[in-house]
């Protein structure tokens, strides 16, 4: 009986944790979803961004106390501007979706919203992690050996 309880708790923690992509699996998925070269942004740059924003974790969240917004999902898309979480004051919801959609293992909605973000004048510079960890750096390592 104890073994079943422990197994249940382990399975529950896996469900809450979400999908953490393997590097090459994510690279192939992003390529398939049209991210390689989207708005002139290389697949390696998208991979670097995802690495430093979420560690490739679809369920990553980060609360920002200053403006009471939250960053969601593999790209850490912010509820102040891009999605609706029902609790961020003055939210814009420019991607026209619920923030919970950004936490799914299927990242199609997250990719569509990230594409919307980079259509704004700031482009990929909207992400602080990209500016701090990827901009003007050799990011080839994020796709190396993935065959993409």
Curated annotation (Swiss-Prot):
GO molecular function per UniProt: lysozyme activity
InterPro entries: Glyco_hydro_22, Glyco_hydro_22_CS, Glyco_hydro_22_lys, Lysozyme-like_dom_sf
Catalytic activity: Hydrolysis of (1->4)-beta-linkages between N-acetylmuramic acid and N-acetyl-D-glucosamine residues in a peptidoglycan and between N-acetyl-D-glucosamine residues in chitodextrins
Pfam families: Lys
GO biological process, one term: defense response to Gram-positive bacterium
UniProtKB keywords: Antimicrobial, Bacteriolytic enzyme, Disulfide bond, Glycosidase, Hydrolase, Signal
Protein family membership: Belongs to the glycosyl hydrolase 22 family.
Other facts noted in the record for this chain: Lysozyme C is capable of both hydrolysis and transglycosylation; it also shows a slight esterase activity. It acts rapidly on both peptide-substituted and unsubstituted peptidoglycan, and slowly on chitin oligosaccharides.
Protein name: Lysozyme C
Lineage, uppermost ranks: Eukaryota, Metazoa, Chordata, Craniata, Vertebrata
